[in-house]
Swiss-Prot record:
GO terms for molecular function: ATP binding; ATP hydrolysis activity; ATP-dependent protein folding chaperone; heat shock protein binding; protein folding chaperone. It comes from Emericella nidulans (strain FGSC A4 / ATCC 38163 / CBS 112.46 / NRRL 194 / M139) (Aspergillus nidulans). Belongs to the heat shock protein 70 family. Induction: Up-regulated when grown with elevated levels of potassium chloride. This is Heat shock 70 kDa protein. InterPro entries: ATPase_NBD (IPR043129), Heat_shock_70_CS (IPR018181), HSP70_C_sf (IPR029048), HSP70_peptide-bd_sf (IPR029047), Hsp_70_fam (IPR013126).
Amino acid sequence: MAPAVGIDLGTTYSCVGVFRDDRIDIIANDQGNRTTPSFVAFTDTERLIGDAAKNQVAMNPHNTVFDAKRLIGRRFGDAEVQADMKHWPFKVVDKSGKPIIEVEFKGETKQFTPEEISSMVLTKMRETAEAFLGGTVNNAVITVPAYFNDSQRQATKDAGLIAGLNVLRIINEPTAAAIAYGLDKKVEGERNVLIFDLGGGTFDVSLLTIEEGIFEVKATAGDTHLGGEDFDNRLVNHFVTEFKRKHKKDLSTNARALRRLRTACERAKRTLSSAAQTSIEIDSLFEGIDFYTSITRARFEELCQDLFRGTMEPVERVLRDAKIDKSSVHEIVLVGGSTRIPKIQRLVSDYFNKEANKSINPDEAVAYGAAVQAAILSGDTSSKSTNEILLLDVAPLSVGIETAGGVMTPLVKRNTTIPTKKSETFSTYSDNQPGVLIQVYEGERARTKDNNLLGKFELTGIPPAPRGVPQIEVTFDLDANGIMNVSAVEKGTGKTNKITITNDKGRLSKEDIERMLADAEKYKAEDEAEAARIQAKNGLESYAYSLKNTISEGQLQISEDDKKKVSDKIDEVISWLDNNQTAEKDEYESQQKELEGVANPIISAAYAAAGGAPGGAAPGAGAAPGGGAGFRNDGVVEENEELD
């Protein structure tokens, strides 16, 4: 079995790494890229994931899904979800409060949860690792933004389950990046390191103290809804307005035009990290109008000014929470593709009065750290690196219960090191109260109505007593994934009740996950069948054409009658191919067998007459994928071909 892997499941791109033999490999996909777009596309015939999905997005905008990370673990009514829906060409619908993605797939309307879409991306990452490692990958560490809440973490874990992975741990992205930095740098003495992680869709800042392999997170802050895509949106809006001004037409009504514009904006943004200005040229963007324009780095910075400036607020909050002065930060590490933007780098270096550290690859650092953690958690003690690391992470948000009058009483304060267990004793609010409702909230506000309800349960059967007499002990147990168990016990009777906060409102049930796992297997089998079908079609096509070339080149002594017989059959097959692009695999194979049945005896006889053929005279593409007879390119008869 292959070793455990680390997967950085990103909003826009994902990355997978493995730690073995004392080194990290960041694994390239089948296109040779070390990061894979977090895109899934559905067409009339197949499902595409990664580069193949992103490459066809302009032709198929309504059925190409991305940004699942901006939906996962959220409610349909969330302000962010509603705002994002304006930018997405795919359809998101409300299903009992959860956002569900709706697409056309093989001529039918299909619905997928964000967890399922994310699981497809995870499956692609898993397959990328399996191709490299040559074995089945079962265990993985998956990363999430440090500021992800309980339901977002749980939903990410579910996505891993649907992808058939045993999720060893959900770890925070900046913490994973800190491991990459710590291993890369071989840090001496105690260092305060600030990780500034700005990716495609999320932003995290974490402050860690690193000393002799102990990585202790002191504080974390961020915005689970800020990243490169928001900068792209600003550019898109800017150019939509410009197009309207120049041509009096609104292209925002056309999904394909918008997608082409967005792709150009993303490219322009990247160019502006190294050039002071760039041009955008899109032929026939909308209603036949060519759109040629340019943008300077200064204008781009102005368009995103508030977003860029806003990244400093979490930095200040982290320093406040950790009670560390900015002059005591030894090293600032930039992670995430968006930290390549010069303005961001300048804001950070101006704030700290020192240059940020750019020694680690911003796209790969998170997967790198996750791979190390995967090796540690799967018990790999072969290396000094894995033996000496201890990770102490924190809870990103305070968690507590509602007490009389809707007051939030936190039991676990934000930035508490996890795993942790905290207990507190409460009592009843009125005389002879038979039970209490325990409501668990997450957030920093003083009143529960302003925080996020994680779940609730009742403790009943409390014997009649005056208010304030019964002793109810509530215990919060926060595990290393940042996922919560809450229990309550009434001391007098020993009555207990507990809940694992799996966000009952939004969480997938066990049955849902099992159904989605079965669906995932089904889609995978369909993908493989489609690949085999296309291989059979291509095999038949190349066999027919190479046979045609062999006949027409006239190198073989074949009678005119035989030549006509073979040529007619080839033309018949090519014409059949043109009209049957969606035929089944066995239909292509039987066509190939028929063609071989006509051609092989004639060509074999011609070879025999010629006393063996010169190299390369035989038709290429030989056997069908099913292993039918044929010739190899070197003129040698395949072993299963009988010669008369």
